[in-house]
């Protein structure tokens, strides 16, 4: 995969989309269906031809690109998104430094891939399976990501499964970010360029 601004923008939009969906689910119990399906599909797409191939096509990242362009404002919702992104990227760094966990993650994702021969990926059973991968493999590495939302919604098992499956998708995009050469300095000094790239992509949708 190429280490270009385009590739980094796609990978970072993948992280943004996952956390924007986490926020939607935590607040309302449901979220943008197309974006949700694209983000979950990305988890199992482990051998793509190129970076955008992880998500199928650029249009599948519309929500993530919009989230990237809008930027992270100082509202409580914006602060939550920032916190989720920082937490996911820190978690991925810890995960990638542990070969045992990375190998376990790879095995569990392959198992989930085989399960899609019998279940639809967006079936409650499959969402629960993806959630358990996050809970068993990623979450113990810590620190835990505290999700803010509507308490009654967050108490529902289906919402918890969706949130964890989406956090796993965020980890998938954070791995991709690292694979295409994404570094912390790109977020600090190259954010403006990524926003411009995202605007170009949105304009052609």
Swiss-Prot record:
Localization, UniProt: Cytoplasm; Cell inner membrane
Membrane-topology annotation of the record: Peripheral membrane protein
GO cellular component term of the entry, any: cytoplasm
Keywords linked to the UniProt accession: Cell inner membrane, Cell membrane, Cytoplasm, Membrane
Top-level division of the source organism's lineage: Bacteria
One Pfam family this sequence matches: DUF489
PANTHER family to which the protein is assigned, alphabetical: HIGH FREQUENCY LYSOGENIZATION PROTEIN HFLD
Similarity-based family: Belongs to the HflD family.
Protein name: High frequency lysogenization protein HflD homolog
Organism of provenance: Vibrio atlanticus (strain LGP32) (Vibrio splendidus (strain Mel32))
């Amino acid at each position: 995969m190429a280490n270009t601004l385009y590739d980094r923008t796609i990978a970072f939009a993948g992280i943004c989309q996952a956390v924007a969906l986490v926020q939607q689910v935590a607040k309302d119990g449901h979220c943008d269906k197309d974006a949700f399906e694209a983000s979950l599909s990305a988890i199992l797409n482990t051998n793509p031809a190129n970076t955008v191939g992880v998500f199928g096509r650029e249009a599948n990242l519309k929500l993530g690109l919009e989230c990237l362009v809008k930027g992270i404002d100082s509202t409580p919702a914006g602060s939550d998104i920032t916190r989720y992104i920082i937490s996911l990227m820190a978690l991925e760094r810890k995960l990638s430094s542990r070969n045992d966990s990375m190998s376990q993650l790879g095995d569990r994702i392959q198992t989930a891939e085989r399960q899609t021969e019998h279940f639809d990926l967006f079936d409650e059973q499959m969402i629960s399976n993806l959630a358990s991968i996050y809970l068993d493999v990623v979450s113990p590495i810590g620190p835990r990501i505290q999700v803010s939302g509507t308490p009654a919604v967050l108490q529902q098992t289906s919402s918890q499964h969706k949130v964890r499956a989406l956090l796993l998708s965020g980890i998938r995009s954070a791995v991709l970010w690292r694979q295409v050469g994404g570094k912390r300095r790109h977020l600090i000094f190259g954010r403006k360029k990524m926003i411009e790239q995202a605007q170009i992509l949105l304009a052609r949708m």
